[in-house]
Amino acid sequence: MRSHYCTDLSSNDIGKKVQLCGWVNSYRDHGGVIFIDLRDRTGIIQLVCDPKDSKSAHEIGSKVRDEYVLKATGTIRARGEGLINPKLKTGEIEVIVDELYIENESAALPFVIGDPNVGEDIRLKYRFLDLRNTESFDKFKLRSKASIACRNALDRLGFLEVETPILTRATPEGARDYLVPSRVYPGSFYALPQSPQLFKQLLMCAGFDKYFQIARCFRDEDLRADRQPEFTQIDVEMSFCTQEDVIKVGEEILKDIFYACGHDIITPFRRMEYKDAMETYGNDKPDLRFDLPMVDVIDIFAKSNNEIFSTPAQNIKKNRAKAIKVPGGDNIFSKRQMQRFEEFVRKFGAKGLAFIQVKEDGLKGPLVKFFEQEQIDELIKRCELKVGDVVFFGIGDKKTVLDYMGRFRAFLANELGIIDENKLEFLWVVNFPMFEQNDDGSYSAMHHPFTMPNNPDEEDLEDITSIAYDVVLNGVELGGGSIRIHKNDIQQKVFKLLKIDEAEQREKFGFLLDALSFGAPPHGGFAIGLDRLIMLVTKSASIRDVIAFPKTQRASCPMTKAPSNVSNEQLRELGLRLKGKETK
């Protein structure tokens, strides 16, 4: 039906006969001549319906309204002097229409296409209209390019694309499973996969050597700006590899993906130990586009003459004292800002926010009187303080201090406006703890229980590290992976450390333990969140902007009204009955 997309045309095509299809973006009648902005997925071009050129086209053009679907045939001509629109890619040309056909009409719109002020609920209810603009199309075009680049890179490296089951069994992977009742086996349930983790390990046991999949995954968890109940990840696994081998593949894939998206990134990426990331930046996914590191000052606080500071500083295993210096901050921050800073950290468990200002005549602030000159001199030296600086302090429980000071670091960077939004700072965080302690004192796997520990014979679980690695971009975790356990005895030992007894091991993971018993090769891999990656590349405010039909933050779809009720007959077929609720 069409000869060109709208923005395929330029001044080089003047005099060419074309046939275009699209939607009416806007229309206007100027002195009997009708001008229509025709929009397709690439952009906009101006149609001119002049009765001098075609009475029939002018007559039909007088009937069009916003979002009518048109087919237009005409000739490209240059716009007149002073009529060029520099805001349009096709702003130097227009189409003199000799034939116009209305393919379809449109009802009154619930909102103006492309209006940034429309609420998200109404946008998602009419998602098919919300997507009907070039900005949205460009994001999905970029997503498509990224997927193609990923597949091409992995194919070049010898990986096989293999699809793994969507209907599987429930396994503990950190979040709640979505369950699907079985009609054939009443009372039994499938689970939608949180990841293809176990299946890709089984493919390594099968000798496939190199696997990948752009996989759909499902997690029934509380949602945030960068989370969805169903999401897509680039899933990779390889045999006979080391951590270095896997990281090299990950970097090569990311380099190709970002090149396809218009960015030439430098490899290899920086590396940082998990412990260093936590102690210096307060989290395991630091944003390295700005500085503001945390400095350890617990030994200085241990010598304070105030027990509020000295007592917690005596226990360096459980507590922390951290300082963040802001160069020139004393000349930047107002009293009101300083109050806001304290209000901010209190939201995350801080009891307050101590600070010291560096003046011409020395250090000032409520903390100074609690230290001798020797400690003051050490603070100046360690924090590299200069006149005009301000340094903030956090002291107390290790987990709490690292959390709120890490958050405060990012908050300060935003307040100071020092984050370069066009910068891409990649980082590998390595050597994660194998286990983390829960609020009830029990332990769980930090990544998952199939990760190879570095030192499985260590008695203290908190001292066991794993061969695990995360890739971080601008303070956001893009993905991660690990070298896997490939020996049955080590896997059983890890299960035992997690208080999973032999009966439960056989019940939930018998197929994996069997596979590890028949000559499983050393293997490892990683997964990268494709949705999150595209969100960052396109600078979208939410992951929902780069998913064609996303769920809301309450895991619902306003457009299809999912999740929905089902009939009693459907429930009976599945052997189910809802407590206290009957449906028709």
Swiss-Prot record:
Tagged with keyword Membrane: no
Gene Ontology CC terms: cytoplasm
Complexes and interactors: Homodimer.
Molecular functions per Gene Ontology: aspartate-tRNA ligase activity; aspartate-tRNA(Asn) ligase activity; ATP binding; nucleic acid binding
Region (Aspartate): 197-200
Protein location: Cytoplasm
Record family assignment: Belongs to the class-II aminoacyl-tRNA synthetase family. Type 1 subfamily.
PROSITE patterns with a match to the protein in the record: AA_TRNA_LIGASE_II
Superkingdom per UniProt: Bacteria
EC number: 6.1.1.23
Annotated Gene3D superfamilies: Bira Bifunctional Protein, Domain 2, GAD-like domain, Nucleic acid-binding proteins
Signal peptide annotation: none
Reactions the enzyme catalyzes: tRNA(Asx) + L-aspartate + ATP = L-aspartyl-tRNA(Asx) + AMP + diphosphate
Location (main, coarse): cytoplasm
Binding site for ATP: 219-221, 228, 477, 529-532
Keywords (A to Z) from UniProt: Aminoacyl-tRNA synthetase, ATP-binding, Cytoplasm, Ligase, Nucleotide-binding, Protein biosynthesis
Marked site: Important for tRNA non-discrimination: 30, 82
Function as written in the Swiss-Prot or TrEMBL entry: Aspartyl-tRNA synthetase with relaxed tRNA specificity since it is able to aspartylate not only its cognate tRNA(Asp) but also tRNA(Asn). Reaction proceeds in two steps: L-aspartate is first activated by ATP to form Asp-AMP and then transferred to the acceptor end of tRNA(Asp/Asn).
Name of the protein described by the UniProt record: Aspartate--tRNA(Asp/Asn) ligase
Organism: Campylobacter fetus subsp. fetus (strain 82-40)
Enzyme class, spelled out: ligase
InterPro entries the UniProt entry points to: Aa-tRNA-synt_II, aa-tRNA-synth_II, aa-tRNA-synth_II/BPL/LPL, Asp-tRNA-ligase_1, Asp-tRNA-ligase_1_N, Asp/Asn-tRNA-synth_IIb, AspRS_core, GAD-like_sf
GO biological process: aspartyl-tRNA aminoacylation
Residues that hold L-aspartate according to the record: 173, 219, 447, 484
Lyase is among the record's keywords: no
